[in-house]
């Protein structure tokens, strides 16, 4: 299902009602004292995280939300009724920014999390509050305060545990198809993936994790080349990055070690924090190498890559197209995720201004 992951909206909480300036006028009490009640508070606006919502598309069509004004106070000490609050339901993973300052107002990271994003104005005071020993018939009252008014930018960042990195045509979409229920487009040409994809990987009946596939990076991506760099924001909440490398490229001029090193370089240039996440090397397309040559090809690559990058993390040779080697990878990911704490959400890159579409497929 396609969904919008960014929207801009205007919100205005309700103004407070005005206080009343009235006096008791009862039989036999023609000069009664003040009895003007206070105005009601304006309705506030809240954002609530809802795991049953997967998109911000509703906020593309309805962009203005204005809270109800509090009612004015009345005579006989009648206080005005408060304005009704507005509840805006958003997907879990939505980050709410002040559009003008880019300050993060709220980060909806858990289901049913509720955050006030615009406070309703206080009701004005009735003249009953201004009575004193020297002023027994006050005509003073105050008007209600204005409700808060904001322009907001909503950004949905997918909540995936594992993210896939690599050049176009490295086999990322093939891998996510092989081990999850996601069904991204797969073809034998680069740039097949044009939008991020999510897939739920079932380890067993009780364990699963979410994997995100984004369009491939190319050299020069940090300077704007290709599609992948604009989608990297969707990997910021992942806990493990899988760097897929085509170990058997068809192009004789291709150098897998050089290409893999280039991807890491682009990642560091664009987002050093993302580059510092645990990153595992996955050597794909083992099926294209004769069986008797596979072990040597893997050893030679690892030796050259470690020399070029000082990499000392785990390495998983696989053939995504037929599933070879994917089970050890899945179990290793599951075990590592169990030992890791959930990432702190809030320290996010605020420079992404593009609006994207994501394809989410789960079981």
Swiss-Prot record:
It is found in: Cytoplasm. It holds the Pfam family GTP1_OBG. Keywords: Cytoplasm, GTP-binding, Hydrolase, Magnesium, Metal-binding, Nucleotide-binding. GTP binds at residues 166-173, 191-195, 213-216, 284-287, 319-321. GO terms for biological process: ribosome biogenesis. Residues 346-356 have a biased composition (Acidic residues). It is an enzyme of class 3 (hydrolase). Residues 1-159 form the Obg domain. One of its GO terms (molecular function) is GTPase activity. PROSITE patterns: G_OBG, GTP1_OBG, OBG. Coiled coil: none annotated. GO terms for cellular component: cytoplasm. Its main location: cytoplasm. Its cofactor is Mg(2+). NCBIfam families: Obg_CgtA (TIGR02729), PRK12297.1 (NF008955), PRK12299.1 (NF008956). Belongs to the TRAFAC class OBG-HflX-like GTPase superfamily. OBG GTPase family. Monomer. This is GTPase Obg. The gene is obg.
